[in-house]
Design a protein with these regions (language model features):
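ATP-binding N-terminal substructure of ATP-dependent carboxylate-amine bond-forming enzymes
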Residues: 1-94
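Active-site nucleotide/adenylate-binding loops and adjacent lid/helix of ATP-dependent enzymes
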Residues: 4-5, 100-177, 195, 227-242
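Short, well-ordered alpha-helical microsegments
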Residues: 12-13, 74-76, 129-130, 163, ...
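Short, charged, surface-exposed secondary-structure boundary motifs
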Residues: 38-40, 98-104, 211
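Internal nucleotide-binding/catalytic subdomain
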Residues: 153-287
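Active-site "cap" helix and flanking loop/linker of ATP-utilizing ligase/carboxylase catalytic domains
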Residues: 237-259, 276-354, 364
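Generic C-terminus detector
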Residues: 363-366, 370-418
């Protein structure tokens, strides 16, 4: 099999690395890729959101299968375009994209199928929003754009002025969803879907703020697996996963591909926060190093609707993923900073037990690695428990150095007692 992965972030580097470990592929391409993927695959300088360019690349390079890692190609119709032309690819078709791309649609879907979600209200008028907030003075809310937007585009606050100022900036282009603030443990549930069942990947817990109580980001770290009590795991299946899959089939939105569910474990039980129709970053960087099953075996099972028969082989170890970001992120990152040289052996991710390095906002320029975005490198430590994995991740981050680099110092801490 000859495979093309669409994307250029750290998540896509991790996915490409997973494919590179397969015994069943004889060609691996990434579009457009990055400095990390070029050592394990052939990077293709095309726009992954342009269906015609992707199709032409598949034809030119005899590509059999396309894996959509990043969200942009999903929302430009790449999957439907390729499937119509006989190229295998799995992922949410246009009819299912509203699960992620329209939060109000998603909330109505969960309401129809009795899936627990935060209390929520849709607003398209700032005056009505203002009146609502004044009636609930002092309460803490989360405000997000109704349309698809980066996860850092949100606010979690009890301050009227802050909530209104943020909401006005969104309402110019999209309605907003106002939700109750939930207290609890955030987890990320990742599923492969086919027409008859699903395969659950190791559950992660992501750190989405710049610091505890800080600004929202695209994700600053993740741990895997999450130590959940058996009754909580069963509640996830009974109240969220199974009703979601039933709803997808009932509403003719079922598809073969990835579904990621963001959940908060509260004292009321698991509550669904968001759906994503692709892998999440940085959860993917955390779970990929732990999975021993060949990804092509999983995809073949998906193709033949036999996912439920797959016994996923997962390491008994733990992983801690740590994101190194540019100064200024999550606001306006200061880019163009040169990374200190890294040993080639580390960049290749070839040594068992060594930290993994997955590259995001970094490009090679004049023989040097230069930052090009907010989140630059994800360092993943693997260890016999979360504490040991944490130690390995923070030892590994010492090799990622550039002016203004920063990262959270507490990834995994909340799980040490377990």
């Amino acid at each position: 099999m000859r495979v093309l992965v669409l994307g250029s972030g750290a998540k896509d580097h991790a996915i490409a690395w997973w494919f590179s470990q397969s015994r069943l592929i004889n060609g691996l391409f990434v579009a457009p890729g990055n400095v990390g993927t070029e050592s394990i695959a052939t990077n293709l300088a095309i726009d992954p959101s342009d269906a015609k360019q992707v199709h032409e690349a598949c034809t030119t390079n005899d590509i059999d299968f396309v894996f959509v890692g990043t969200e942009a190609p999903l929302f430009t119709g790449v999957i439907d375009y390729l499937n119509e032309r006989g190229i295998d690819t799995f992922g949410a078709p246009n009819r299912a994209l509203k699960l992620e791309g329209d939060r109000n649609f998603s909330r109505m879907f969960t309401d129809r199928h009795n899936i627990p979600t935060p209390t929520h209200v849709l607003f398209d008028d700032e005056h009505k929003l203002s009146e609502y907030l004044k009636r609930h003075e002092g309460e803490r809310f989360v405000v997000k754009s109704n349309a698809i937007a980066p996860s850092r585009v949100m606010i979690d606050s009890s301050d009227y002025n802050s909530l209104m100022e943020f909401s006005k900036s969104i309402l110019a282009t999209s309605p907003i969803i106002l939700e109750e603030h939930l207290k609890g443990l955030p987890i990320t549930v990742t599923l492969f879907l086919d027409n008859k069942g699903y395969l659950s990947l190791p559950t992660c817990s992501d750190y989405m703020k710049s610091e505890e109580g800080g600004l929202p980001t695209g994700g600053m770290g993740s741990i895997c697996p999450v130590p959940l009590q058996e009754e909580v795991s069963q509640a996830l299946v009974d109240t969220i996963i199974e009703p979601t899959l039933f709803g997808l089939k009932a509403e003719r939105m079922a598809y073969k591909g990835v579904l990621t569910i963001s959940v908060i474990i509260t004292n009321r039980g698991p509550i669904l926060v968001d759906y994503h129709v692709r892998f999440n970053d940085p959860a993917a960087q955390a779970f990929v190093p732990l999975i021993k099953t060949d990804i092509v075996d999983i995809l073949n099972a998906m193709k033949h609707d036999t996912l439920s028969s797959i016994s996923l082989e997962v390491s008994t170890k733990s992983a801690v993923a740590l994101v190194v970001a540019s100064e200024g992120y999550p606001g306006k990152p200061i880019i163009g900073k040169v990374l200190d040289p890294m040993p080639a052996s580390l960049m290749l991710n070839t040594f068992e037990g060594a930290p993994r390095y997955y590259f995001g906002g970094v490009q090679e320029k004049d023989g040097k690695l230069v930052t090009t975005g907010g989140r630059c490198v994800t360092v993943v430590g693997v260890g016999y428990n979360i504490m040991n994995a944490n130690k390995n991740a923070y030892n590994g981050v010492k090799h990622v150095n550039f002016e203004g680099a920063w990262y959270r110092k507490d990834i995994g801490d909340r799980f040490f007692e377990n």
